[in-house]
Amino acid sequence: MAGITDGPFRRICTSWGAGLTYSEMVSAKGLWYNDKKTADLMKITPEERPCAIQIFGSEPEIMAAAVPKVMEFKPELIDINMGCPAPKIVNNGDGSALMKNPELMGKIVRAVADVSPVPVTVKIRKGWEDTRVNAVE
């Protein structure tokens, strides 16, 4: 949840007993281009752990290349965002727009999982639209 799940929010959650927190979504392409603001989203303090770092993108190679950069921050797991419905995300083919292409979703998950030393999870929606529920594909 961009702009919500920052460090202070995660610390509040863990202080109230949350068993796992998540970073704001991090652009794999931003990491590809070594964007400092993107990298800053991955900073995790000991009080926020266990913490997952959530990445998004639509290119398997760039998503896989993001993993070593993500691992510099030692997350307990990596979450792939394939569920964000925000227009600025889906208009680039990222987030929930990937629900229209289950084959590409599989390639992205495989690319990330193949290089990740920590568990990988995926955030999805039940489908791109109400008339096409394809989450089980």
Question: What function would you assign to each model-found segment?
Answer:
Residues 1-76:
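Glycine-rich, positively charged N-terminal anion/phosphate-binding segment
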Residues 12-15, 61-98, 102-137:
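Alpha/beta enzyme core
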